Amino acid sequence: MSEIIKYITNYAARNESFSASDLLNDSGFPYLTKRTVMNSYLSKLTNEGKLHRVGRGTYVIGYGNHCFNPEIGEKSKRLYEFLKQEFPLVNMCVYEGQWITPFMYHLANNQAVYLEVEKDASEYAFHKIKELEGNVFYRPDKKEIEKYLDLSNGPVIIKNLVTESPLCEQNGLHIPTLEKFLVDMYCDSDFYYLQGAEYWRIMHNAHQYSINTSKMFRYASRRNALQKIKRIWEESINDFE
């Protein structure tokens, strides 16, 4: 990818939307001070789907067209519905370890079901789930996972739900948005095996999906990871083909 295209895509990733004039005034590349040259690059990136035109001379970054629409297993449905019946006013979400697989380079057999519950109710939820399941863990850290958990054996993991987490509803259940999922994989200690070089690859593969970067960055800010998440996101798009 040429340095000029890298410059434009990085600029687009940093801004929710931008005009041709914005780019022209901000440009650190002397070639882009000529509007005809700049327009040719904007047209090229728009035709390739790397930018989208949303108005006269206004652009947003264009990511993949795939939507994050994971299949929810019967066990996840049963446990979520059980908890929701016990705690109808408590915010919660459910997801599965196998949803991570499409993003990974080194595949891991994670068959866990994760239930995130409001902090004040999460320990109560843990004890309630233990009435149904024997293989249940409450907020396990790296040491506990390495010593006691076999993720391939379908454990249930109860965690605290971060306030104002971006969630969506699917088949009557609340699940994480992909934006939340990506940030949590970086921040949560129980996802230690996804961090480092593997996480960069996960973010690289996430460019195939439709991502609301404003939503992702707001949530990353709540988790005190904004600058690191932004840097990895911007670096990973440069090599995405």
Regions found by a protein language model. Give the residues of each.
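Hydrophobic alpha-helical interaction segments
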Residues: E133-E241
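Residues in well-ordered beta-strands of folded domains
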Residues: V60, Y114-E116, I157-N160
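Short beta-edge/loop segments at beta->alpha junctions of small alpha/beta modules
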Residues: Y11-P88
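Positively charged, polyanion-binding regions of nucleic-acid-associated proteins
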Residues: M1-R14
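Short, well-structured alpha-helical interface segments that form or flank functional binding sites
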Residues: V37-S40, Y124, L173, T177-K180
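Short, charged/polar micro-motifs that form catalytic or ligand-binding hotspots
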Residues: G28-Y31, R35, L115, C168, ...
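Short gly/ser-rich loop at a beta-strand->alpha-helix junction or flexible surface loop bordering the NTP-binding
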Residues: G57, E74-S152
